[in-house]
Amino acid sequence: MNHTKVIGAGLLCRGVVVAAALMISAIVPVEAQTIKVGLILTYSGSDAALGEQIDRAVNLFVKLHDSELPPGVKVELIRRDDTGINPDLAKRLAQELVLRDQVQILTGGQWTPNAMAVAALTKEGKVPFVTMTAGGSAVTLQSPYVVRTGWTLWQTSYPLGEWAAKQGWKNAYTVVSDFAPGHDGEAAFTKSFTEGGGAIVGSVRIPLKTTDYLPYFQKVKDANPDVVYVFNPGGPQATAFMKAFEDIGITKSKIRLIGPSDITYDQELPNMGRSALGVITLGQYSPSATRQANLDFVAAWQKEYGTDSVPTFFAVAGWNGMHAIYDAIKAQNGKIDPDATMKLLHGWSDPTSPGGPIHIDQAGDIVQNLYLRRVEENSGHLANIEFATIEQVGDPWKVFNKK
């Protein structure tokens, strides 16, 4: 066989194929370019309502902003259920999303233990990971491909300890759920409160699966501190904590209850009832805020999900996360390069987020306004009413542990 002729025949065939392809492309629209985004949240179990808040915010953002994507570009969300705090399952789901489903961006990150497991994978695989609500400071240290759009417990608890000390309260007790964010919150509040001249007279870490809180809270009552710093992961646990404080008589005593916004979770306030009245929290969002950006957000939310549905700070973290992802996609015209994506995300900003102006710093952490809120009756229902602002707070833990 004449080798030269075979090559020539191949070239001729390829020329015919190319010509045919060009003819077809002239009459058939170019196939849309799909960006696959893996979304790992809790869709089942006792904490599914928290995951639903994030998922609803993601859906709402996509519905309102899909038309802003470059022509021919679409986003496909591939959802996976981590069932709750389950780092092994979260890691496996992330591996499947990257290797089998070929996602180009990971997001979700509802729980710190799960987000830590997922983040560790992204370094080797070079997959951008936008964690939305994991509050442990260490999450963004696991990989240069991680940013967060929610908060950290150091961010919400260190300034709260400073504020508490300035109120003249001398003695504090800390009560936290026993996992990484609780440890962070305890450490942050303790540091700032004692730096301000206060003393920690007792502390307790409560296992996440505990349902009987009274033995723990009896110790708090016996210590009779001026103030109790409380952290739990929100949702139904927030109501269980508050009801236990009420049952043992702390909510009716002179002991003040304070904490990050998880402990008066907006969706749970109707279940807490009057036991939550007067509780002060520090957080990045309240649906009752009168900022125009928030009024617009709540209106869009309730148009989509009904007037009885209330967006929480979990929802806003999901909204911020999808906004950052969409902006990264638009900036690259739908061509996702991992390193270029991370360069865009570090420094990304939104001056009109529902919670106020935000940006992501070079450590991958969100910088945002924090609001002191008090549970009050508002138009016949309980609400977290903002009464003071601490502007543009980053993650203090990163500052204190800078190498």
Where do the PLM segments sit?
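Bacterial N-terminal signal peptides
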Residues: 13-26
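Intrinsic, low-complexity polybasic segments
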Residues: 9-10
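Extracytosolic ligand-binding ectodomains
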Residues: 2-6, 15, 32-403
